[in-house]
Amino acid sequence: MNVPVGLQTFLALDFGIKRTGFAVGNRLMRTAQPQGTINAEGDARFVRIAERLREWQPDALVVGVPFHPDGAEHENTLRARKFARQLHGRFKLPVFEVDERYTTTEALAMGAKDADAAAACIILEQFLRSIP
C-alpha cells in the first residue's frame, strides 16, 4: 500500500561518532519534533535505530551531512555518507542527505537542552522545505 504523499513521515538523524540525534516530521505539516539522542556506536547504534523505526514507521530517512563552511568535504562528511548508505542497506528505506552546516550551532543558539535532537529537527525542517 502506498502512503499518500501528504502523509509521508520522515525520521531525521543527526549523526555523530558517539551520539545520534533524532527528529520526526511529516510532509503535510512540514514541521519536525525532537525525539531524543542515543549514545551508541557500531552495531548497538543500529539496534537503537531499529527501535526508533519500529516506533515511528517512517517512509524515509533524512541524514545530516556536515561540510566545511566553504562547502568542502572532510572526514565526518565521509562518515555521515557511509552511515546513510548503511541505513539504506540495513533498513531498505529511502535515505536523503541534507547539508547540516551550522545546525548544532543554531540549536545551541536557540537554547536547546539536547543539541543533537534539536539539530535533527533543523535538518528535517530544511529537508521538508526543499520538497514540493
What is the predicted function of each stretch?
Residues 2-13, 17-132:
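Phosphate- and other anionic-substrate recognition elements at nucleic-acid/protein interfaces
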